[in-house]
Amino acid sequence: MTEISIATSVPSAMPPIGAQPDGPAKVTVRDLNFYYGQNHALKHINLALATNRVTAFIGPSGCGKSTLLRIFNRMYDLYPGQRAEGQVLLDNANILDPKLDLNLLRARVGMVFQKPTPFPMTIYENIAFGVRLYEKISKSEMDGRVEKALRGAALWNEVKDKLNASGLSLSGGQQQRLCIARTIAVRPEVILFDEPCSALDPISTAKIEELIDELKEQYTIAIVTHNMQQAARVSESTAFMYLGELIEFGPTNKIFTSPSDRRTQDYITGRFG
C-alpha cells in the first residue's frame, strides 16, 4: 500500500473519464441503469474491474456506490420493485440474465458487509456452513478448508484453539475477519467490501486493509468506502460517483492527485459530501 497526497487544485486540461482497468477485466459494466421502482438510481454506468486488483468506489451518501456493488451479485433480486438494465459481464457472461443461477453467482461473487455478521454458531461452523451449501466434502477436507480460510483471513493463529467457541464471542475486528474467512471458504473469484471498516477501531481497520492487500493476489476486489485515505491506500483504481452517475474513473493516484472533474476535486478535498 502507498500513501497518496490529495491534490488541492484541478489541472486546466479536462480529459474524459476513463472506463478501462489497469489490466484484464474480470467484471465489465456496460450502459447499466438501475431503478428502485420509478426512481432512476444509477444512470448509464460504464466501467471495468481489473482482475486481481482493488477498485474503490467513493462518493457522498446516496450517490449509488453501494447500489452498484449489490448489482454485482444480484442482491437486489431479494427486494421487489428493483430492476437493472444493461450488461454486467463476469468473464464475458452477463450476470443480469434472468436465467442465471443466483446461488452459483453468489458463490463466485462474495460480499462482506459494513457491520460484522457472524452466524450464531461456532467459529468452525461459521466457515463450514457456506461450504456445505455448494459442496459435499469429507470431515478431513472440511477441516482443511476451514483452516485455509481462517489463515487466508489472518485469523487462524487467534482462534485455532477455540474453534468450537461462538463466533459472536470474538471482537468486532475478529468478527469481520471471520466474515471474510467465511466468504473466501467457498472459493469466490470476486469479493465485494461494503464499508468493511466503518464500525471498527483503527487497529482493526489496519488489519483489514493489510488483508485486502494480500487477498488481491487471489481475488478481484471492489470496495465502497467513505474514507478517502483508505481508498488511496488500498486501491489501484478509483471510481467517483455522484447522484447516480459515474463522474470519473481511473488510476487511484491520478484521481487523488490530478482529477479531471471539478466535482471529484471538490469531494476529495472535503468541499461537499
From Swiss-Prot:
GO-annotated biological processes: phosphate ion transmembrane transport
GO molecular function terms listed in the Swiss-Prot or TrEMBL record: ATP binding; ATP hydrolysis activity; ATPase-coupled phosphate ion transmembrane transporter activity
TM annotation in the entry: none
SUPFAM superfamilies for the chain: P-loop containing nucleoside triphosphate hydrolases
Residues noted as binding ATP in the record, renumbered to the chain: 59-66
Topology relative to the membrane: Peripheral membrane protein
Disulphide-bonded residues: none
EC annotation from Swiss-Prot or TrEMBL: 7.3.2.1
Family: Belongs to the ABC transporter superfamily. Phosphate importer (TC 3.A.1.7) family.
Role according to the record: Part of the ABC transporter complex PstSACB involved in phosphate import. Responsible for energy coupling to the transport system.
Protein name, UniProt field: Phosphate import ATP-binding protein PstB
Protein's organism: Rhodopseudomonas palustris (strain ATCC BAA-98 / CGA009)
